Amino acid sequence: MPDGREGAMSGGGAEARRHSGRTGAGETKPLQAGAGLLFLREEEIRLAQDLLFFAYRDFTNVADLILEELGLGRAHHRALHFIGRNPGITVTDLLGILRITKQSLARVLSVLVERGYVAQSPGTDDRRQRLLTLTETGQALERRLFERQRERLTAAYREAGAAAVEGFRRVTRGIMDDEARAYVDGAERGAPPNPHPRGA
């Protein structure tokens, strides 16, 4: 019995080439946005879930090996990353980015502060605020973790090419909610973090 792919590719070789992006001369061209919408089929979406899962697993695993040596976990890594990206970030803003409970973040920060990776200082305008920065030791650890993950990401970028990298960014951005997009927009401009752009 014909399956969904056979039905979608029916209508002659020209139609098949239009959906696949092939020109008929052995060359390929980028698919137009929405061309055939074959990528919206259920199996394609499930495959995308597989891709996201395995990519995240293997991307984080290269850093996990270092973290395990130090008795740390991914929650500590995420905190190190965003504190390093935003020196002087408040605990409130970090909570807005990570979306974990205050108790969970308190446990994470307690370990990082006790081990000398993170320093806390009171806010200049509001002394009740706690501003977070990485110490030299914390910067060194964050850099070590970054270099491991950069190797994996750089290799993937080089293999895929510039057009695919741009497509990857557009897809991942499309998955994010408005607050995450606002943060990324600010990071691209070099602006301070704003995890609650709508006053949430």
What does each model-identified segment do?
Residues 38-42, 66, 153-163, 183-193:
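Hydrophobic/aromatic-rich alpha-helical bundle segments in the mid-to-C-terminal region
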Residues 107:
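DNA-binding alpha-helical recognition surfaces that contact promoter or target DNA
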Residues 166-200:
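Exposed, interaction-prone assembly regions rather than primary DNA-binding/catalytic cores
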Residues 1-70, 200:
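N-terminal leader segment of winged-helix/HTH proteins
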Residues 57, 61-104, 115:
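N-terminal helix-turn-helix DNA-binding core of bacterial DNA-binding proteins
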Residues 6, 10, 14-25, 60, ...:
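Charged, amphipathic alpha-helical coiled-coil/dimerization segments
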Residues 45, 56, 87, 98, ...:
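Flexible interhelical turns and helix-capping residues at alpha-helix boundaries
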